[in-house]
From Swiss-Prot:
Record GO terms (molecular function): aminoacyl-tRNA deacylase activity; ATP binding; leucine-tRNA ligase activity
Origin organism lineage: Bacteria, Pseudomonadati, Pseudomonadota, Alphaproteobacteria, Sphingomonadales
UniProt name for this protein: Leucine--tRNA ligase
Residues the record lists as binding ATP: 615
Catalytic activity, as annotated: tRNA(Leu) + L-leucine + ATP = L-leucyl-tRNA(Leu) + AMP + diphosphate
CDD domains: Anticodon_Ia_Leu_BEm, LeuRS_core
Cellular component terms per the entry's GO annotation: cytosol
Annotated family: Belongs to the class-I aminoacyl-tRNA synthetase family.
Motif ('HIGH' region): 42-52
Name of the top EC class for this enzyme: ligase
Gene3D superfamilies in alphabetical order: 2.20.28.290, 3.10.20.590, HUPs (3.40.50.620), Isoleucyl-tRNA Synthetase, Domain 1 (1.10.730.10), Valyl/Leucyl/Isoleucyl-tRNA synthetase, editing domain (3.90.740.10)
InterPro entries the UniProt entry points to: aa-tRNA-synth_I_CS (IPR001412), aa-tRNA-synth_Ia (IPR002300), Leu-tRNA-ligase (IPR002302), Leu_tRNA-synth_edit (IPR025709), M/V/L/I-tRNA-synth_anticd-bd (IPR013155), Methionyl/Leucyl_tRNA_Synth (IPR015413), Rossmann-like_a/b/a_fold (IPR014729), tRNAsynth_Ia_anticodon-bd (IPR009080)
HAMAP family per record: Leu_tRNA_synth_B (MF_00049_B)
Biological source species: Rhizorhabdus wittichii (strain DSM 6014 / CCUG 31198 / JCM 15750 / NBRC 105917 / EY 4224 / RW1)
Biological process annotations from GO: leucyl-tRNA aminoacylation
Length: 835
């Protein structure tokens, strides 16, 4: 037997066997119970990175384990293949986005196969192919027919570099998430999906997702943002054009007596009316438009206002007037596009009031005695009683809210209502490399759906990327078609769908891929929902919320009988690495540094923080040469070891070397040529505890704990004398490690003379009787202090334990021949000698 595991030979051989035999192809008609394991599919950038490897290794271990436990497992792979990077590559490298994307897919597919993932490649899909996006177009039209899709003019986040619209979630600190350009606010006709129709259901459904991380559920709850409050009317003291009043929504009607101003959005009808002939206000509104529509950006931007010179009448006191501002922090598409400001109890309002010298009046205090306590630099947002508020004085905050709403409803100037932070999903993107929206615009008929028998609407190949913007707008023929309704000349919609639409249903298409429809309902329902979904927490709002909405929308129109797409969700940590700089402050890759020295120059390198691997800081480790040098199993083992999977994992050279040594150690341990005879009850017990414990750890995604148990069992097997028990333990170990180091396991399984593949073998069964220890450790105390420990048979009688304790060498020496006054025995736990 070779003492060293030949990973190069084994990896290639067994990967070929699995592929040729279709080992991991899931059968829709299998009589076995079904299990659907899925990692978030990747964007085909061209290279697999270590974050991918960690993510897919976790899912792979679970998928392989569940196969061994008797499940028919669906574990597919595909490509989230539309998006801006392909268009950027087209502009920079003069290559068609489709060619660039498909070449990247081929490269990444090969890389994934070299790591030995148990994937069903027969179900591979790419969202950029017409057989996928054509079915997406069919679903879009179904939702359109159901009234869940509409088009309207809307203020949007416009990226002037990528020349496309961004969703609020894609604007980070006022900049486009891909280009980094400062985002502008514009009005464009956009297509929307009515996600707000499902707001209550999306919120309520979070309570059923008990296998999701609490932080993800909280993030979605906050994003949906259900607010109970009051909608009421402010009357202007003078008209703005023909407008004399406007509505306001507030979640704090209890603080109305603390109001010191009212504010409206820059695109509010009153602001627009007042701007006519007012260059100063026009300039202010233009400045506001240079701020994106994302709430997070507006929250952090400097608060600015324009005093209109008008006032509004306070609805609780007709003699009380509040100045009206146009403000850059008020959004037209949240609430009513208007607010009242209560500086004492809202930090944003307080900052604004201090800037514009507006009154600050406390109306909530921890106690009545603090009614006159001044407000400093921080607004008071804590609990308390209402003060300085006429008929509300002395009430709690909730009592005051109810009282104001009751008075408003009785007076006819307001009513209690609910609003949501969640906005309808704008899905129009002004770019080429995306799913064409299957709508035709006709001057006479309006927006006309493309007939289903004319799908897919395929992207034209002959496009140019020599200037920014959408090539579909400039195409000489593609957009010119006849109206399906009246036959007159018309034009295609040239916007394409947000790529998050593509990822909102791919998991259903994996389950069923007929050529004539998006999926077969019965087949899809036999797999759905996904039992375990694995991916990064950065998708908590965007992808995961959209996928939950899309599945609900399909359920509403009768396409599928599932509402929640993912039963279990696991968000893994990142893979990190040290960062390095040369003396000039330039980033260096790990390959450019050796023992703290810049390889090229011999100069000392600066070792920086351990951070997420990123191209910008060059601390990326390419998995391909690591797999070549150490083998796929060593890389997989590293990804599972040490750190809990939900935490970050630091990549180190010493760590992968240690994993490679352990893989070779496993190769030696699983050789049972020296079988031996007889039983080793202690080893039997350790084996069966390991079988049960590793299974429980994998089910709980506690891979690092499973790895620790395999180390313990391996140590026990190595130390044990040759015996039948040792041989059995070594054979069982092969199956226990098979989900984690599958190439070694297959090689060892074949060496043992076993039939078939270990991938198809059953998980070892454990004997519950062997999980119970036959022996226990007894603490021996003298006058309450621990002095010795004993090993005794479980259930030993009290007199036997007392005798063993008194005969202990340590205890005999301590007692110095004196008889104890009393001996207290707690069976299986403790002997306490009172001297």
């Amino acid at each position: 037997m070779s003492a060293r595991f030949n990973h190069l030979k084994a990896d290639a051989h067994w990967q070929g066997v699995w592929e040729s035999q279709g080992t991991f192809q899931a059968r829709d008609d299998s009589p076995k119970p079904k299990s659907y394991v899925l990692e978030m599919f990747p964007y085909p950038s061209g290279r697999i990175h270590m974050g991918h490897v960690r993510n897919y290794t976790m899912g792979d271990v679970l998928a392989r384990y569940r196969r061994m436990k008797g499940f028919e497992v669906l574990h597919p792979m595909g490509w989230d293949a539309f998006g801006m990077p392909a268009e950027n590559a087209a502009m920079e490298k003069k290559v068609h986005p489709g060619d660039w994307t498909r070449a990247n897919i081929a490269a990444m597919r090969d890389q994934l196969k070299r790591i030995g993932f148990a994937l069903d490649w027969s179900r591979e899909l790419a969202t950029c192919e017409p057989d996928y996006y054509g079915q997406e177009q069919a679903l879009f039209l179904d939702l359109y027919a159901a009234g869940l899709v509409y088009r309207k003019e809307s203020a949007v986040n416009w990226d002037p570099v990528d020349m496309t619209v961004l969703a609020n979630e894609q604007v980070i600190d006022g900049r486009g998430w891909r280009s980094g350009a400062l985002v502008e606010r514009r009005k464009l006709n956009q297509w929307f999906l009515k996600i707000t129709d499902f707001a209550d259901d999306l919120l309520d459904g979070l309570d059923t997702l008990d296998q999701w991380p609490e932080k993800v559920r909280t993030m979605q709850e906050n994003w949906i943002g259900k607010s109970q409050g009051m909608r009421f009317t402010f009357v202007l003291d003078a008209p703005a054009g023909d407008l004399t009043s406007f509505d306001v929504f507030t979640t704090r009607p209890d603080t109305m007596f603390g109001a010191s101003f009212a504010a409206i959005a820059a695109d509010h009808p009153i602001a627009q009316a007042l701007s006519a002939g007012n260059p100063a206000l026009q300039a202010f509104i233009a400045d506001c438009k240079r701020t994106g529509t994302a709430a997070a950006e507006i929250e952090t931007a400097e608060k600015k206002g324009y005093d209109t010179g008008l006032s509004v009448v306070h609805p609780l006191d007709p003699d009380w007037k509040l100045p009206l501002f146009v403000a850059n922090f008020v959004l037209m598409d949240y609430g009513t596009g208007a607010v009242f400001g209560c500086p004492a109890h809202d930090q944003r309002d307080l900052d604004f009031a201090r800037k514009y010298a507006l009154p600050v009046k406390r109306v909530v205090a921890p106690s009545p005695e603090e009614a006159a306590a001044p407000i400093g630099d921080e607004a008071y947002v804590g609990p308390g009683r209402i003060v300085n508020s006429a008929f509300l004085d002395g009430l709690s905050v909730e009592e005051a809210k109810a009282a104001v709403i009751a008075r408003a409803e009785a007076g006819g100037w307001g009513q209690g209502t609910t609003v949501w932070r969640l906005r309808d999903w704008g899905v129009s993107r002004q770019r080429y490399w995306g799913t064409p929206i299957p709508i035709i615009h006709c001057e006479g008929c309006g927006a006309v759906p493309v007939p289903h028998d004319q799908l897919p609407v395929v992207l034209p190949e002959d496009v140019a990327f020599d200037i920014p913007g959408n090539p579909l707008d400039r195409h000489p023929t593609w957009k010119h078609v006849d109206c399906p309704s009246c036959g007159k000349p018309a034009r295609r919609e040239t916007d394409t769908l947000d790529t998050f639409v593509d990822s909102s249903w791919y998991f259903i298409r994996f389950a069923s891929q007929p050529s004539d429809k998006p999926f077969d309902r019965a087949v899809a329902e036999s797999w759905m929902p996904v039992g375990q979904y694995i991916g990064g927490v950065e998708h908590a709002i965007l992808h995961l919320l959209y996928a939950r909405f899309w599945t609900r929308a399909l359920e509403r129109i009768g396409r599928i009988g599932v509402k929640e797409p993912f039963t279990g969700l696991f968000t893994q940590g990142m893979v990190t690495h040290e960062t390095y700089k040369d003396p000039a402050g330039q980033w260096l890759s790990p390959e450019e540094v050796s023992d703290g020295i810049v390889v090229a120059t011999g100069a000392p390198a600066t070792v920086g923080r351990i951070e997420k691997m990123s191209k910008s800081k060059k601390n990326v480790v390419d998995p391909a040469p690591i797999v070549e040098q150490y083998g796929a199993d060593a890389v997989r083992w590293f990804m599972l070891s040490d750190s809990p999977p939900e935490r970050d994992l630091e990549w180190t050279e010493s760590g992968i070397e240690g994993c490679w040594r352990f893989v070779n150690r496993l190769w030696r341990i699983t050789d049972v040529s020296e079988a031996g005879d007889g039983e080793d009850r202690e080893l039997d017990r350790k084996l069966h505890k390991a079988i049960a414990g590793i299974a429980a750890d994998i089910e709980a995604l506690g891979f690092n704990r499973a790895v620790a148990k395999i180390h313990e069992l391996s140590n026990a097997i190595e130390k044990a004398a040759p015996s039948a028990s040792r041989a059995a333990a070594a054979r069982a170990l092969v199956r226990l490690v098979a989900p984690m180091v599958p190439h070694l396991a297959e090689e060892a399984w074949a060496r043992l003379g076993e039939q078939g593949l270990v991938a198809d073998a059953a998980w070892p069964a454990h004997d519950p009787a062997l999980l119970v220890d036959d022996e226990v450790t007894i603490a021996v105390q003298v006058n309450g202090k621990l002095r010795d420990t004993l090993t005794a048979p479980k259930g030993a009688p009290k007199d036997a334990l007392e005798r063993m304790a008194l005969e202990s060498e340590k205890i005999t020496r301590l007692l110095e021949g004196a008889a104890p006054r009393k001996v207290i025995v707690v069976p299986d736990r403790l002997v306490n000698i009172v001297a």
